[in-house]
Amino acid sequence: MMMHTRKRIFRSPATGPQVQFTDPFSVSPYNNMASRKRKADDDNDDMSVSPLSSPALPSRPIVRPSKKIRQANDDVAARPLSLPRLLETLTNDQLRTVLQTICERHPDIGHEVVTSAPRPTVACALDILAGYQEKLHDATPLGHTNSDYAYFRVKQQLGALLDAISDFTSQFLPPLEQQTNISLQFLDGVTKVIHELPDWENQSHRHHKDAAYDEISAAWALVITEASKRGGGFIVHTGGWDQRLVKHNQQSGGKMGQAINALAVEVGWQGQNPITDTPAPSGRDPNSILNQLINGAYGSPVRVGPW
């Protein structure tokens, strides 16, 4: 870097021409200021190319997902519920009422429902009867369980329970129900329901319970008779149904005599006849397979000839 030199004039003591020369070591203050200014300019130039002072890159706008604005259009309109949604809102009672109404208006649909619906199970049928039984108990006034006042208060609920007993009993009888064990399971459960029917003080009101005993006794007799024809009498003995029937007859006060007679005649009930307290007949044929199984004689050698 070149430095500005300051010219100085020296005069000799003697008179003569003036001599001028330049002092290389003396610097003018003006020259010093100029050099500082150039240095500052150079620094500014250096800073202009520095990354810190470089112009910022243009920022890229952030793309945000645009919100779909739902505008009112023809899709927003009043319309009824679809069939699946409508069925979700119905209670069991409402659904049964609607289905029953449709079946009554269209007998062909009713027939298809009857043939397509699964058969009720014993547990399901007894559970429904328990529901009717609970309604009967809820309608009974406190402190008047067997009076005439209570009878007229629960007459409607009593009739509904008796109708349900009759309808379900027919469902579990042969030939609709081919399995003897299932028929006997239902009869055992429904007989317990009949035992719990009110014993009205007025004799004229007791015909409901007496009629129920007559019907269920006939049902027991039918199942036992059909079981003996198919060789199912052995199930009655081995399953303990004969003993249960005897207890039911005792609890009813001897009102299930028809079933007891069928048990004694068709199957061969072993023990005392609960009606006459005499030994019950062992069946029509003492040499039947059932009696041989009971007596332990089945499979024993059979003698042939006079000896």
Curated annotation (Swiss-Prot):
Comp. bias intervals (Basic residues): 1-10
Superkingdom assignment: Eukaryota
InterPro entries from the UniProt entry: Cut8/Sts1_fam, Cut8/Sts1_sf
Compositionally biased spans, kind Low complexity: 48-61
Region called Disordered, residue ranges: 1-63
One Pfam family this sequence matches: Cut8
A GO molecular-function annotation: proteasome binding
Cell location: Cytoplasm; Nucleus
Keywords recorded for this protein, A-Z: Cytoplasm, Nucleus, Protein transport, Transport
Protein family: Belongs to the cut8/STS1 family.
Subunit structure: Binds the proteasome.
Name used for this protein in its record: Tethering factor for nuclear proteasome STS1
